[in-house]
Amino acid sequence: VIKVNRRGNPEDTGAEAKPSAFAWARHASAGFGGNSLPEGARRRALADWIVHPDNPLTRRVIVNRLWHHHFGKGIVTTPSDFGLGGDLPSHPELLDWLAEELLRNGWRLKPIHRLIVTSAAYRQSSQRVDAKAASLDSGNRLLWRQNQRRLDAESVRDAVLATSGKLDITAGGPGFKDFDYTEAYAPVYRYVSPDKPELWRRSIYRFIVRTTPHRFMSVLDCPDPANLTPARIKTTTALQALALSNNEFMLRQATHLATRVDNESGSRAEAIRRAFALAFQRSPTDAEHRAAETLVAEQGLFSLCRALLNANEFSYLD
């Protein structure tokens, strides 16, 4: 039997603690049957309470995180705090409507993703110029334009591998370890970067060492895995430019990309167009093509591919 400690003092116990939900949430019974029920039944009661059709909070939190993922900022900018200490929603009616859509679609996330990415708000350009809107809403809280967003660390890694043609898109199965493990007085993890297919899987399958963050990923603002991170911090530093330009992984993938475009092209001009198509999903402008021709003639395809993988256009979504 667990009892409530008065003022946190274990020597001064009060009433018996019983499984229950928050009393302020009145969409369903706050009691879960007391301690007489088996643990499995109490867990089921909690799960049913969380996803009860009359409980909008769970759905609001979920759709807000989906919105945050696509726009870089949620309708509520404090994704882990919907209480009195959190931010107010910028579009409360939209938040509630999306929450109801989630329920209507049987809690499936894919329809909500589709709904968001096909919306007029999402399909706006971040380059839109509107002096009046900028003066009234410089932070773009009301979404009069799209937010320019930089790819997160995992997406940068996956995009580089996809562009070079080395990304392993196999779904499921065991993850990969990009570190060596040594048993000592305390475990020692040393990150390695051999150029082999086992390490070319998507980043979602990468084993995370909570006590030893990956340096390259950390430089690109991958959060410390030992801490809870409701929203990632975005920074722009010289270290990021140096890492993207000189990291061993980036140099190897630039080499693979150069080999790929060379094999898939019959001429230098065609190789340049193919490199731009793979990296930027477009053809080069006349000025870009002339500059690329000069660079390739002097330093080879590797230098062009290295430059493309380091360009803002590769790492940012407009």
Positions of predicted regions on the chain:
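Active-site Gly/Thr loop motif
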Residues: 202, 212-221
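Charge-dense polyanion-binding interfaces
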Residues: 300-314
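Glycine-rich phosphate-binding loop at the start of an alpha helix
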Residues: 235
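Exposed, low-complexity/repetitive linear segments and helix-based recognition motifs
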Residues: 218-221, 285, 310
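Conserved beta-structured recognition patch
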Residues: 207
